[in-house]
């Protein structure tokens, strides 16, 4: 029997709705990965509602929880760590310590960093210290980095001017540590208005993917968390980088189609669960020559 992969997911949790682990855990489980959720914050709802209740996890709890898993002999079974929204830079450093602890017992374990700083339509949504931590410390430790356009621009200290420029900026990030950069949402001058564009860059290749841009009165939150989670899950299940890229794009589109059909502000993960596991649509990534 083929072994089921295990992934430690360290990011936010909301009681109502879908963001952070609340957007990523169930879909990753649905495609066949055992997920260990470690919630950096527990909020009543995501912050784009404008009000919320809850609290941030004390940074010291992160290594304590990782050590607790070690104490029962399971830490070596962790195949990957995924981190997302951080409540503080101190939390981020605790996560890096946890990643190092896991890699010490399983050198093949991967670390995917979703460097949540902001969104083009929402601006910066984390404290300055968190952005500084991501820009200066996390990038060097990540095997896979999954920024959006705003975050890619922040890493490089300037705005991208074209698709080719985005590729060059992603290649610059590869020189700082990661082996894969997945730009979850491209937003550069001259891009198509009716398409949602994504980019995958490795040391050898670059791939561009377009899918239809769906209209919403308010853009659902958690799409990036869902994308990063599904990409990591499919890699653990044996997909190539490009296969995982294409699968994540298709599965996310299926969720958005269901969300749009329900006229919902929250991602409709449960209603779309069968199409997450087996997307009916397929988007083919195009290899770029630069």
UniProtKB/Swiss-Prot annotation:
It catalyses: pyridoxal + ATP = pyridoxal 5'-phosphate + ADP + H(+). ATP binds at residues 114, 151, 184, 211-214. Pathway: Cofactor metabolism; pyridoxal 5'-phosphate salvage; pyridoxal 5'-phosphate from pyridoxal: step 1/1. It comes from the Bacteria. Keywords: ATP-binding, Kinase, Magnesium, Nucleotide-binding, Transferase. Pfam families: Phos_pyr_kin. Its EC number is 2.7.1.35. GO terms for biological process: pyridoxal 5'-phosphate salvage. Substrate binds at residues 12, 47-48, 225. InterPro entries: PM/HMP-P_kinase-1 (IPR013749), PyrdxlKinase (IPR004625), Pyridoxal_kinase_PdxY (IPR023685), Ribokinase-like (IPR029056). Its cofactor is Mg(2+). Belongs to the pyridoxine kinase family. PdxY subfamily. HAMAP family: PdxY (MF_01639). Pyridoxal kinase involved in the salvage pathway of pyridoxal 5'-phosphate (PLP). Catalyzes the phosphorylation of pyridoxal to PLP. Homodimer. This is Pyridoxal kinase PdxY. It comes from Pseudomonas entomophila (strain L48).
